[in-house]
């Protein structure tokens, strides 16, 4: 090599050495000062969490993209854009107890499906995470609707008033506490005592009143309305009383148009031959019917009302009248609906029921004995411990299935757990002797329900 070539060689070597040194210094700096990176990550996660409304979120190391240095060992070179794009998909959480409402599973009830030759599916509404019933959807939608209209303001000390036989009150009480409201519930004193006990534990004020017709000012719904009107007179703190009015508020059926109906449609792929449900306020059956028929054009899908004994809705659907004028609610000063079943069955037409009444194709009347026997059957054959309204739904689903071709798909609801019906409905089942070992082994569903004429 000539002397004249030495500067060129030296320059190349120097450039290579400088480049390598730069890499080593950069990596070494990062290894020598890991705390700087940790501080940056903590600060970045706090800022990102606040922007997403999720406070206290820490991104686990497992979710960070990192590379290693052969010389200096592990070096974290975070791909910040990658972490940002995956921050929500890396975790599966919901915000608050209201995030546990909806998207309940659709369960095939094997014993009923095998007995009828149809596929009987039940939407497990008892798995809603606030109050454990479909009333969670209604309560949440009524509260959100009131907030949007300025009728409820979080943190102002407002109180939600409602007249209910239990489930709606439990849902309202749970969500009220979660959203910063108080809750005042009026209910008949012939409802299962565990419902009012649960309401007390949820922090609600509970008034149990004697059963009365809707024409009486002492009817539990009218009392709740009056308590809401009296609120500002007895509270000088600037708070207001909001009467939820589940029977007449259209936010009730709209909750099912927005959530329950679409979920059923998605879970069945739109392939269902009948939907069966009871009606108290009427919001569930009306809302689901409106979605399936009016929005998805499933006009061939039969919507069937499941009605307990003592209720007038069966006659309204079948014959166009509730009952004779001498039996009109309010004519006789006593409770008209005489049944062990709670939550469904009524002798008046509510705004919610009327909104979907013309979409209901048929009705099935279910006796208390049939409901009790179905509840026990579901425990013994499917491990489903249900309340009274669920039992009525399932009896009606069986009757409906037997009127359809084999292989038809019938959807109904598992409304709530039997835990809320121990002192009344399930006590009556025990008194009937249905929990005896000999009775528990019944294998003929139709004989058990007194429906032998329906057997194929």
Curated annotation (Swiss-Prot):
Record keywords: Membrane, Mitochondrion, Mitochondrion outer membrane, Transferase, Transmembrane, Transmembrane helix
Primary residence: mitochondrion
Cofactor(s) listed in the protein's UniProt record: pyridoxal 5'-phosphate
Transmembrane segments: 9-29
Reactions mediated catalytically: O-acetyl-L-serine + hydrogen sulfide = L-cysteine + acetate
BP-aspect Gene Ontology terms: cysteine biosynthetic process from serine
Recorded topology in the membrane: Single-pass membrane protein
Gene Ontology CC annotations of this record: cytoplasm; mitochondrial outer membrane
Family annotation (InterPro entries): Cys_Synth/Cystath_Beta-Synth, P-phosphate_BS, TrpB-like_PALP, TrpB-like_PALP_sf
Compartments reported by the entry: Mitochondrion outer membrane
Record has Mitochondrion as a keyword: yes
EC number annotated for this UniProt entry: 2.5.1.47
Recorded superkingdom: Eukaryota
Described function: Putative cysteine synthase that catalyzes the conversion of O-acetyl-L-serine (OAS) into cysteine, the last step in the cysteine biosynthesis pathway. However, in contrast to cysteine synthase cys-17, this CS-like protein may not function in cysteine biosynthesis.
Protein family: Belongs to the cysteine synthase/cystathionine beta-synthase family.
Protein name: Cysteine synthase 2
Gene (name only): cys-12
